[in-house]
From Swiss-Prot:
Belongs to the peptidase M16 family. The modification Phosphoserine is found at residue 243. Changing residue 364 to A: No effect on catalytic activity. It is an enzyme of class 3 (hydrolase). InterPro entries: Metalloenz_LuxS/M16 (IPR011249), MPP/UQCRC_Complex (IPR050361), Pept_M16_N (IPR011765), Pept_M16_Zn_BS (IPR001431), Peptidase_M16_C (IPR007863). Its EC number is 3.4.24.64. Disruption phenotype: Simultaneous disruption of the mitochondrial presequence protease CYM1 results in synthetic lethality in respiratory conditions. PROSITE patterns: INSULINASE. It holds the Pfam family Peptidase_M16_C. Binding to MAS2 is required for catalytic activity. Inhibited by high levels (> 1uM) of zinc. Inhibited by metal chelators ethylenediaminetetraacetic acid (EDTA) and O-phenanthroline. It catalyses: Release of N-terminal transit peptides from precursor proteins imported into the mitochondrion, typically with Arg in position P2. This is Mitochondrial-processing peptidase subunit beta. Changing residue 249 to A: No effect on catalytic activity.
Length: 462
C-alpha cells in the first residue's frame, strides 16, 4: 500500500507545476475596518464557495460563558433582522446554494457554496446571519435543548471524550483547555445577554477573513465585502492576524483515568507539546507523525508494512484494535502524540504502550531509513492534494491559514517546505520534542493497568 502511494505521487511536483500555471494563486486585500479578503480563482468552473472566518471560538470564552460561540452557531440560521428562518431557508433553496457552519476552539466559520452569479446573495446572507441575528428568546430555549442532546451524543463518542479531557489537563485553567460545547451547566444557563456580549467583544473586522474559491472574481468579492461587512466595527487595539492575542499557552504535565469498567476497550491518549500552525518545524512534526503512522486491525494491513510499529501490532492481533498518531496545531501551541484503542487487559495495554514508546525512541536514536523519510514526505504531499479537492476545501484551507498565520502558503510552497525535510531534521526534532519533556495522558475504560505518566516519561527518556 505504501509503495503504491509513493509511486502514485512520485510526479506530484510536475502535477503541481501544471496546476499552478493554471491557477493564479491566493490574492488578498483588506478593508478599512481590517477585514481581510482572500481568494483563489479556479478556471473552468461555474460555482464558488465563500466563507467568513472569525478569529474567535471557545478559546475566546471564559469559564462562565464557555459554550457561547457554539450556541451562536446554532442560532445563526434561526432568523435575522432582515430575514426570518423560513426566509433564509427559502432564499438558499431558490438559488440552489448550500449553507453551513462550524465552531472550533479557535474559529467560528460560516460558508456558502453557490453558482457564480449568486455569490453576491451568498455574501449578503453570510453577513446577515453573522452580524444581525435576532437571537430570539424562544429560539434560544429551543436550541438549548438541541445542544444538550448534542452534548449527550458527544459523551458517547469515546475519542471526543478522551481528547476533551486531554485538552483540559494539558491546558489546565487556560482557554485552550475548554470544550467547544461547554459544560452542561453553562448550556443550561447561557442567556441572550451572554450571546450579544460575545458578539460585541469578538466579531470585529480585523478578526475576520472572507475567503472565496472557484469562479470568484477577487475585485468583485472585495466590493461585496465592503457592502455587506464594511459596517463591522474594528477593534480598539487591533492585533494582526497570526499574532498572539494573549499569554502563550502553557503545556501542563498531568494524567486522568476515567474508569468505565463495563467498556470492552480501553482508550488512551498520550501527548507531548507539539507545534503551532506557524512554527518553523510544523512540517517536520507532520513528517515525524507520518513515520509513526496509523494502524487499524479492521483494515488488515501491517505484516508487510514498512512501519515496525504496524508490524508489531499486526503480528500480535490482540495487541491493539487501532492506533493513530496525531499532530494537533493551534495558533500558538500544539499537541503531538498517539491515540490508542485496545482490549481491556493488562497484557495488551502494557505491550502497546511499550511498543509505541519503543517506536518514538527508535526515531530519536536515528534508526530510521531514508526510505521511511521519503515515504512520509510523499504521504504528506499526497494528503495535501487530496485535502484540496473542490472549492469548499480550498476555502477552508485559505481561511484557516490566513486567520491563524496571517498568510496562506500555496500548495507549491508547502511542497517546497516538505521537500527540504531531511532525516537529520526528524531526528533532531524527535530529540528536542520527545526527550525530557512533560507528558500528559488520558485513559478511558478499564484503566487499572494503564501505565501512568511517570512510567511513560521514564521509559521514553531511557
Amino acid at each position: 500500500m505504501f509503495s503504491r502511494t509513493a509511486s502514485k505521487f512520485r510526479n506530484t511536483r510536475r502535477l503541481l507545476s501544471t496546476i499552478s500555471s493554471q491557477i493564479p494563486g491566493t490574492r488578498t486585500s483588506k478593508l478599512p475596518n481590517g477585514l481581510t479578503i482572500a481568494t483563489e480563482y479556479i478556471p473552468n468552473t461555474s460555482s464558488a464557495t465563500v466563507g467568513i472566518f472569525v478569529d474567535a471560538g471557545s478559546r475566546a470564552e471564559n469559564v462562565k460563558n464557555n459554550g457561547t460561540a457554539h450556541f451562536l452557531e446554532h442560532l445563526a440560521f434561526k432568523g435575522t433582522q432582515n430575514r426570518s428562518q423560513q426566509g433564509i431557508e427559502l432564499e438558499i433553496e431558490n438559488i440552489g446554494s448550500h449553507l453551513n457552519a462550524y465552531t472550533s476552539r479557535e474559529n467560528t466559520v460560516y460558508y456558502a457554496k453557490s453558482l457564480q452569479e449568486d455569490i453576491p446573495k451568498a455574501v449578503d446572507i453570510l453577513s446577515d446571519i453573522l452580524t444581525k441575528s435576532v437571537l430570539d428568546n424562544s429560539a434560544i430555549e429551543r436550541e438549548r435543548d438541541v445542544i444538550i442532546r448534542e452534548s449527550e451524543e458527544v459523551d458517547k463518542m469515546y475519542d471526543e471524550v478522551v481528547f476533551d479531557h486531554l485538552h483540559e489537563i494539558t491546558y489546565k485553567d487556560q482557554p485552550l483547555g475548554r470544550t467547544i460545547l461547554g459544560p452542561i451547566k453553562n448550556i443550561k444557563s447561557i442567556t441572550r445577554t451572554d450571546l450579544k456580549d460575545y458578539i460585541t467583544k469578538n466579531y470585529k473586522g480585523d478578526r475576520m477573513v472572507l475567503a472565496g474559491a472557484g469562479a470568484v472574481d477577487h475585485e468583485k468579492l472585495v466590493q461585496y465585502a465592503q457592502k455587506y461587512f464594511g459596517h463591522v466595527p474594528k477593534s480598539e487595539s487591533p492585533v494582526p492576524l497570526g499574532s498572539p492575542r494573549g499569554p502563550l499557552p502553557v503545556f501542563c504535565r498531568g494524567e486522568r483515568f476515567i474508569k468505565e469498567n463495563t467498556l470492552p476497550t480501553t482508550h488512551i491518549a498520550i501527548a507531548l507539546e507539539g507545534v503551532s500552525w506557524s512554527a518553523p518545524d510544523y512540517f517536520v512534526a507532520l513528517a515525524t507523525q507520518a513515520i509513526v503512522g496509523n494502524w487499524d486491525r479492521a483494515i488488515g494491513t501491517g505484516t508487510n508494512s514498512p512501519s515496525p510499529l504496524a508490524v508489531a501490532a499486526s503480528q500480535n492481533g490482540s495487541l491493539a484494535n487501532s492506533y493513530m498518531s496525531f499532530s494537533t496545531s493551534y495558533a500558538d501551541s500544539g499537541l503531538w502524540g498517539m491515540y490508542i484503542v485496545t482490549d481491556s487487559n493488562e497484557h495488551n495495554v502494557q505491550l502497546i504502550v511499550n511498543e509505541i514508546l519503543k517506536e518514538w525512541k527508535r526515531i530519536k536514536s536515528g534508526k530510521i531509513s531514508d526510505a521511511e523519510v521519503n515515504r512520509a514526505k510523499a504521504q504528506l504531499k499526497a494528503a495535501l492534494l487530496l485535502s484540496l479537492d473542490g472549492s469548499t476545501a480550498i476555502v477552508e484551507d485559505i481561511g484557516r491559514q490566513v486567520v491563524t498565520t496571517g498568510k496562506r502558503l500555496s500548495p507549491e510552497e508547502v511542497f517546497e517546505q516538505v521537500d527540504k525535510i531531511t532525516k537529520d531534521d526528524i531526528i533532531m526534532w524527535a530529540n528536542y520534542r520527545l526527550q525530557n519533556k512533560p507528558v500528559s495522558m488520558v485513559a478511558l475504560g478499564n484503566t487499572s493497568t494503564v501505565p501512568n505518566v511517570s512510567y511513560i516519561e521514564e521509559k521514553l527518556n531511557q
